[in-house]
Amino acid sequence: MSKIVKVLGREIIDSRGNPTVEAEVHLEGGFVGMAAAPSGASTGSREALELRDGDKSRFLGKGVLKAVEAVNGPIAKALLGQDAKDQANIDKIMIDLDGTENKSNFGANAILAVSLANAKAAAAAKGMPLYEHISDLNGTHGQYSMPLPMMNIINGGEHADNNVDIQEFMIQPVGAPTLKEAVRMGSEIFHHLAKVLKAKGMNTAVGDEGGYAPNLESNAAALAAIKEAVEAAGYVLGKDVTLAMDCAASEFYNNETGNYELKGEGKTFTSQEFTHYLEELTKQYLIVSIEDGLNESDWDGFAYQTKVLGDKIQLVGDDLFVTNTKILKEGIDKGIANSILIKFNQIGSLTETLAAIKMAKDAGYTAIISHRSGETEDATIADLAVGTAAGQIKTGSMSRSDRVAKYNQLIRIEEALGSKAPFNGLKEVKGQA
């Protein structure tokens, strides 16, 4: 009953108004899975390739008809008659057929959309929720947890049209007893932050990930505004709520000078100086997690940063590791960072994503399931976070349906699983248990 009878791809629109790939996988018995590939703005140079058409007469060159053709042509032909329950085989067929290291023939956007749609179809055929099927694929049947959200309530960098260099300023409602209560706390703080910003005469328009995107005098000013909002909402920073940042430092790294240039503050730092700049912010604002605190190729700098901060806070590799087990293994061997951000379109298939999560956990690293800045209503990452018991999720702010869709799916899953999926709060963050 799980034999593939049809694979269909189409071009749809993501949350930035750009095209992306959506795929359907149809099985015997009428079971169907549908999924869409997300898209990043600040991307690691070693990510799997997102195939775009380059035809300037359509979508300013960002069309994905070539990727869709790959789904409807060679991928569909190769998968017809295959068993959808054998996810590893489905992904291997597509990867082998593509034949490139970075999936540049078909595009990671094509392969991933089919990979996820296949998992959804297989779950339907098994008569179970997607998170349960993912738990089976992960070899951890029935081992669930609800993830601690990282809520990006001030957007900067490549995600916003403002003068703030650091890309994401996030809250983590660590004191909540449940995921649903964590969402409530995040929502309250989000609305109080709007009041704080308006009182300062600042803009409350939102960026790509649903957080506010005001012009600010410094990165510290963003943290100070959030601290004020946390307290206005009746919560205690460091007890009820902790802070996290995604620097996306590759975006303000000067390749010629080797320095980090915070243009919003008019400051320039060497690699070690920037680590100490971050160290001061962590002390002042009780930050427990920093992502991509240096340029993705600054491995010596990351080794130093891990030495200085790695036993105190979570140091997350995103552009650094790009959900790639080869790169992650090198990082683990060299003692670089202590956590990995998991974005399945960086690697391009569900099987490879699960392998990266397993490698991280086996090495004592945390794994944070993440959206991309270009999203759709597809909420697969919610099921992925629960089904792998990853422990943390990063899926934007408390506005924009492309972000809220994931929180709403998590609320539904928590309701269904109850005590089978505990919410562990701060214990999930590396160095904070």
UniProtKB/Swiss-Prot annotation:
One of its GO terms (cellular component) is extracellular region. Gene3D superfamilies: Enolase-like C-terminal domain, Enolase-like, N-terminal domain. Its EC number is 4.2.1.11. Changing residue 326 to Q: Decreased enolase activity. Strongly reduced enolase activity. It catalyses: (2R)-2-phosphoglycerate = phosphoenolpyruvate + H2O. InterPro entries: Enolase, Enolase-like_C_sf, Enolase-like_N, Enolase_C, Enolase_CS, Enolase_N. NCBIfam families: eno (TIGR01060). This is Enolase. The gene is eno.
